[in-house]
Amino acid sequence: MAATSPQWASPLLVTSCFVALWVAVTWLLSYASGWVALARLYRADREAVGIPVRMRAARMGRGATGQFRNVLTLWVGTEGIQLRLQWLFRINSPDLFVPWTEIAVTRGRQFFFDYIELKFLQAPDIPLRLYGESAERVCAAAAEHWPEKKMELAAPL
C-alpha cells in the first residue's frame, strides 16, 4: 500500500492557512498597538516627503504588542513626520502623518537603552518610542523643526 499525505497537508491548503493567519494576526496587532486609533486622527493624505529613516527598534503604545523591529520607516519633513510600515505588515495600518505642532518629545532611559518618546496631542495615551541610533537620526533629520519644548497635552474627554 502506498502512503498518501493527508488532505490537510496539501501545499495550497497550508499556504492558504498561513496567509489567513498572517492577515488575522496583523489585523489584531494594528488595533492592539494603537495604530488604528492614530489612523483615525492622523491618517496621511499625501505621499511621503522628507528624509526617510528606517527604525531598527520602536514601540507604539504601552504594551508589548506594538514592537516594531526593522519594519517601520519615518519620513522626517519640514511639516511633520510620516510613519509607514513595510507592505507585509501594512494590513489595517495606513500611513500616518503627524505635524510637528502635534508632537511633544521627551527623552528617557529604560534598562540600558536610551529612547526618545513622541506623544501626540490628540492621542497622548499612544506614545511612540524610538530607540538607539535611529532615534538620533530622526532628531538630526528634523533639525530646527524638532519640537524642543514640551507642550500641554489635551485633557482626556
Annotated model-derived regions:
Residues A2-V76:
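Anionic N-terminal interaction surfaces
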Residues A9, G80-I81, P124:
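Short leucine-rich amphipathic alpha-helices used at interfaces
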Residues R40-V53, E102-L157:
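Acidic, Ser/Thr- and proline-rich intrinsically disordered linker/docking segments
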Residues G50-R56, Q86-S93, E133:
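Short charge-dense sequence patches
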